[in-house]
């Protein structure tokens, strides 16, 4: 019995070391303010919180953490309010939610879509080459849109 336990342990260590790999990442800070958090990943509210919330007032600069393209933009009176999703070459995507407004280029794009659809609420999926962003590029400003209880940036990294 002990032989099988030792064998199983060795096999688990061997296979887990093959599967585990590290990817060094050095992201640009998503917000131009001290990293004071008002909400953390996994805390339970009415459901589990899926990101981190950076405290701050409305209108604080929000930046792309890495090069990529905007793969989704939404404006809604509920949920994330004004939100940007960026897909990065490393396979991650980053989410920036409850924005008070978008950067001028994104704002222009989304306003034209709102007028075209005659709706405040829009959900757009720009093509990969349509809205490229660079690491550290301004994408919006912190806010209190959607289902939010105070100005902040809700931020997520997804894989």
What are these regions (language model features)?
Residues 150-157:
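Histidine-centered catalytic micro-motifs
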Residues 20-93, 100-102, 120, 129, ...:
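Surface-exposed, glycine-biased beta-strand/turn segments
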Residues 88, 157-159:
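Residue-level signal for short segments within beta-strands and strand-turn junctions
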Residues 1-25:
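Bacterial Sec-dependent N-terminal signal peptides
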């Amino acid at each position: 019995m002990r032989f099988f336990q030792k064998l199983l342990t060795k096999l688990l260590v061997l296979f887990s070391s093959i599967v585990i790999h590290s990817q060094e990442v050095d992201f640009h800070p998503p917000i131009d303010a001290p990293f004071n958090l008002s909400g953390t990943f996994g805390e339970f509210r009415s459901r589990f919180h899926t990101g981190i919330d950076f405290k701050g007032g409305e209108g604080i600069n929000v930046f792309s953490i890495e090069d990529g393209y905007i793969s989704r933009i939404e404006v809604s009176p509920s949920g994330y309010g004004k939100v940007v999703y960026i897909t990065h070459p490393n396979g991650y995507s980053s989410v920036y939610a409850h924005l008070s407004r978008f950067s001028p280029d994104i704002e222009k794009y989304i306003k034209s879509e709102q007028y075209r659809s005659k709706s405040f609420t829009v959900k757009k999926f720009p093509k990969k080459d349509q809205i490229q962003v660079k690491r550290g590029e301004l994408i919006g400003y912190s806010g209190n849109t959607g289902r939010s209880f105070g100005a902040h940036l809700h931020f997520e990294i997804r894989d």
